[in-house]
Design a protein with these regions (language model features):
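Conserved NAD+-utilizing ADP-ribose enzyme module
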Residues: 1-91, 98-109, 115-183
């Protein structure tokens, strides 16, 4: 191996914004609820903060949801911090649900227009300790909080964040077996 072979690994990294550093601080200390209270009814959130949060949501949405542990509070956070969607109604798919959560009415916020992406999530980690589900829903424009950002498109996920209570005609297309190693 030559020194030149390492050039691709030694490329300059993009600068982390102050907004992202702040959000990482909030996330690492599980201070989301306090943060929501501090911005509620305050001055409007900057575009830079919304874009930084959107990237963090794409990367860590499941963990943020788990840390907040209250979908009504999470919905408030998403409504305040995500860039506003300005598009048409869509048919969306979700594979990020397992049967236990679905049966409890806990439907997730992240959906895609690409059924193959939803299938991947339905068969994967989301089929842990319970069968995975592939869902289809009609999403009126008013139900979509944010469309895909550049990072989501780069990952090939084309993730739309929605208010699940505003979706209609949610149907289970397929059920995948529980992939837990130990049952």
């Amino acid at each position: 191996m030559k020194l030149e072979d390492f050039a691709a690994y030694n490329r300059p990294q993009s600068k982390v914004s102050d907004e992202r550093k702040f959000l990482d601080y909030i996330h690492s200390r599980n201070r989301w609820v306090e943060f929501i209270k501090s911005i509620d009814n305050a001055k409007p959130v900057s575009i830079a903060m919304k874009n930084s949060f959107h990237s963090q949501w794409v990367e860590s949405g499941a963990f943020i949801r788990e840390k907040i542990n209250d979908d009504s509070i999470l919905l408030k956070l998403l409504t305040l911090l995500l860039p506003t969607y300005d598009g048409d109604s869509l048919v969306l798919y979700r594979g990020g649900e397992n049967k236990d959560r679905f049966d409890k009415g806990l439907i997730g916020f992240c959906w895609t227009t690409d059924i193959s992406v939803a299938e991947k999530f339905g068969r994967g980690l989301n089929a842990y300790k319970s069968p995975g589900l592939l869902l289809r829903a009609e999403a009126p424009a008013c139900s979509i909080l944010a469309g895909p950002n550049a990072h989501s498109r780069y990952l090939g996920e084309n993730e739309f964040t929605v208010n699940p209570s505003r979706l209609s005609n949610i149907t289970v297309i397929e059920t995948y077996p529980d992939n837990s190693f130990f049952k």
